[in-house]
Every structure is written in C-alpha cells, then in structure tokens.
Amino acid sequence: MFQLLIPLLLALKGHAQDNPENVQCGHRPAFPNSSWLPFHERLQVQNGECPWQVSIQMSRKHLCGGSILHWWWVLTAAHCFRRTLLDMAVVNVTVVMGTRTFSNIHSERKQVQKEEERTWDWCWMAQWVTTNGYDQYDDLNMHLEKLRVVQISRKECAKRINQLSRNMICAWNEPGTNGIFKVLTPAQPPPPSRETVGHLWFVLFMEPRDSSKWVSSVGA
C-alpha cells in the first residue's frame, strides 16, 4: 500500500513569482463558513478558499485534482497516470489554477514539463464535480466542492486498518451521515509545536481507492 501512496510531482513551466519570499506557503484568508458547518454538508468552494487546488488536464479534459506545493511544483496521485510522463505526449498535459469552475475559458493554464498523535482543528476534502444540469462527461462545466470530515483516534483507526503507520491519520464523515472512512498521510512531517503553526494548511495524501476524487487538507 505504501508504494501506491507515492506522489507524482509535476514541474510547472513558466515564470516564478517575482517576489516569492513574500508568499507565505499554507496561508489563506479566513472564511466564515470554515468552522461551524456540519460535517456532512457539501458546499461549493468560495473564490480564494482553496488557492492551492488545481485541475490537471489531458487534452483539455480533467484528469485529476492536485495541490500546489511550491511555485514550481504540483502534487497529485501517481495512479492518475497509467504511463509515465516520458511515455506521454507532454504537450497535452496542462495544469489549470486560479479558478473554482471550468466554465471560465480564461482560466490560467501552465504547461507541464517532463510520533505524538496530532489533533487538527479542521480537516476538509476538496473534489472537482460536474455542475448540476450538465453531462457528467462535460469537463468544461465543473466546480470545486468541499466536505468537512472529523479526525478519529489512532486506537479507533487501528481497528479498521491493519497496517497503520505512525505518519497516518484517519478521518471520516460525521457518524450517521453515510460517511466514508479515509486514511490520510501528511505530505510533510508535522511542525514541532502548535504555537509555530498559526493557521497553516497542510496537504494530505488520500488512501488509494479514494484519491482519484478527493484531495485533502488540514488546518492547525
């Protein structure tokens, strides 16, 4: 299972930001509906709420979601690509960013080149879904949707997962709402202390069978 969790890193071709030192990774504006919503509600993401979320597309069709890790790098699931980028027509692979819907044809596109258990304040999953009223295969009419989940303890998680490593956390929808159990792996080690975190957001890997739809993030 560990091998399936290995991420695929895609390099972005283009100009880096002029002043990257002024950009604080993991920070975004506060949104009023991020803390009090019931766990089972799915809502369209507001503009700027998930600035790290992108759409990886093949021949202008949505392939998989991804998260910006760096101004040159995007993280996505390796199983989204049945072949390596060396075997693919790379010119047809693009990353769409800066939008929450695909109906905007002016969205920015970038060409792709070849120990101690921590409790998070919030845990959200984001998914690209087809807009109501459109065909599910119409990839130009999709929007970003979010779902809040709750973290469960390692002891409870271990009852469901046989090979639960120390760098994994588990979360699921609120009990009684037909929630799906998730296993998440942080993309980087947790910070040393809560005081240094503030309101940073961290990207998590999704357990393989679910990761084609959802990209998770947590806020401390």
UniProtKB/Swiss-Prot annotation:
Xref: PROSITE patterns: TRYPSIN_HIS (PS00134)
One Gene Ontology cellular component annotation held by this UniProt entry: extracellular region
Chain positions carrying an annotated carbohydrate: N33, N92
Disulfide-bond pairs as recorded: C64-C80, C157-C170
Keywords in alphabetical order: Disulfide bond, Glycoprotein, Secreted, Signal
Chief location category: secreted
InterPro entries the record matches: Peptidase_S1_PA, Peptidase_S1_PA_chymotrypsin, Trypsin_dom, TRYPSIN_HIS
Biological process terms in GO annotation: proteolysis
Stretch forming the signal peptide: 1-16
Subcellular location: Secreted
Protein name listed in UniProt: Serine protease-like protein 51
Organism encoding this protein: Homo sapiens
